[in-house]
Structure formats: structure tokens, C-alpha cells
């Protein structure tokens, strides 16, 4: 069971849900400057997705927890992240760093949420790579990244 305290995103919505999961995945950063991380290695990532909104769907959900798990865990668990199209380009916004993994998860979750009638929004994605290292992605309102 996960029992974490995460940095909180400020938002104006009435409802907020958080979905925790673990993902076991390998990756490498194909840059000399990445040091040891330039070699294939793995992590058991801890991922927390925060979704918020004002309206519930017909089932009384903001979004079904199982769909969030399928979108993330179902896509990345027990894989080499570099093999995914999301991380296959050789540019800084496609390398499977913790920062890019968090933003990519956000992009995928928000794309799904945009299809829902009740229009919830992903306000934060937290990705912990090690016990001492994590990244939080929060989209900027009206910016290119959110």
C-alpha cells in the first residue's frame, strides 16, 4: 500500500482525486553528460496523478481510477521506456528523464480527460524515480505545456 504525502497543486475545483501506482521500467539517457544513467538501468517508479473538476460523470466519478491505471501502468509497466514512441526522438523533450516521463504521463492522461463530458483536468503528475529523487509536473494555464 502506498502512503505518501505529495506536494499539492492549488486549483479552483470542488473535487480532487489522486491515483497512486508503481511502475517497474528500464530506461537510459543517451547522453555522455548523463553519466551512469547513460547505461540501461531500471526503477520502480512511484506515480501519483492528481485530477480535479467540478462535475461528476453519470456514475458519480470524476474519472474512473481503473482507467487512469490502464493509461499509465498498462502502457509503461515492465517496459524499456526508450522503446516507446513517446521517448524515441533524440531531443531533450523526448528523452525518458523523470521530468519528461512526468510530462508525458500528463499529456496522455489529459488527452483522455479531454474526451469526457464532465471535463476533469489533470492538475499534477508526481513521479518518484528513487527514494530521494522525484519530479512534479504541473501545466501552466494557457501555456504551451498545458
UniProtKB/Swiss-Prot annotation:
Family: Belongs to the PTPS family. QueD subfamily.
EC number in record: 4.1.2.50
Essential cofactor(s): Zn(2+)
InterPro entries: 6-PTP_synth/QueD (IPR007115), 6-PTP_synth/QueD_sf (IPR038418)
GO BP terms: queuosine biosynthetic process
The organism of origin for this protein: Bacillus subtilis (strain 168)
Positions of Zn(2+) binding: 27, 41, 43
Alphabetic keyword roster: Lyase, Metal-binding, Queuosine biosynthesis, Zinc
SUPFAM superfamilies linked: Tetrahydrobiopterin biosynthesis enzymes-like
Origin: domain of life: Bacteria
Function: Catalyzes the conversion of 7,8-dihydroneopterin triphosphate (H2NTP) to 6-carboxy-5,6,7,8-tetrahydropterin (CPH4) and acetaldehyde.
Protein name (record): 6-carboxy-5,6,7,8-tetrahydropterin synthase
Pathway membership: Purine metabolism; 7-cyano-7-deazaguanine biosynthesis
Enzyme category, top tier: lyase
Gene name tied to this protein: queD
Keyword Lyase set for record: yes
Assembly: Homotetramer.
Cofactor note: Binds 1 zinc ion per subunit.
Pfam families according to UniProt: PTPS
Record GO terms (molecular function): 6-carboxytetrahydropterin synthase activity; metal ion binding
Coiled-coil intervals, chain numbering: none
Miscellaneous remark of the record: The active site is at the interface between 2 subunits. The proton acceptor Cys is on one subunit, and the charge relay system is on the other subunit.
Active-site residues from the entry: 37 (proton acceptor), 78 (charge relay system), 129 (charge relay system)
Transmembrane segments: none
Gene3D superfamilies according to UniProt: 6-pyruvoyl tetrahydropterin synthase/QueD
Catalysed reactions listed for this entry: 7,8-dihydroneopterin 3'-triphosphate + H2O = 6-carboxy-5,6,7,8-tetrahydropterin + triphosphate + acetaldehyde + 2 H(+)
Statement: the UniProt record of this protein carries the keyword Metal-binding: yes
Amino acid at each position: 500500500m502506498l502512503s505518501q504525502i505529495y506536494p499539492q497543486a492549488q486549483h479552483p475545483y470542488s473535487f480532487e482525486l489522486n491515483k497512486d501506482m508503481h511502475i517497474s521500467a528500464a530506461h537510459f539517457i543517451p547522453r555522455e553528460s548523463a553519466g551512469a544513467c547513460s547505461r540501461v538501468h531500471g526503477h520502480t517508479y512511484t506515480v501519483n496523478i492528481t485530477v480535479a473538476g467540478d462535475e461528476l460523470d453519470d456514475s458519480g466519478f470524476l474519472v474512473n481510477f481503473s482507467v487512469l491505471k490502464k493509461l499509465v501502468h498498462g502502457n509503461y509497466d515492465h517496459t524499456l521506456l526508450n522503446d516507446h514512441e513517446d521517448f524515441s526522438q533524440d531531443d531533450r523533450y523526448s528523452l525518458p528523464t523523470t521530468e519528461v516521463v512526468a510530462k508525458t504521463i500528463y499529456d496522455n492522461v489529459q488527452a483522455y480527460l479531454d474526451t469526457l463530458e464532465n471535463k476533469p483536468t489533470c492538475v499534477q503528475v508526481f513521479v518518484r524515480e528513487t527514494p530521494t529523487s522525484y519530479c512534479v509536473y504541473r501545466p501552466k494555464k494557457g501555456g504551451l505545456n498545458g
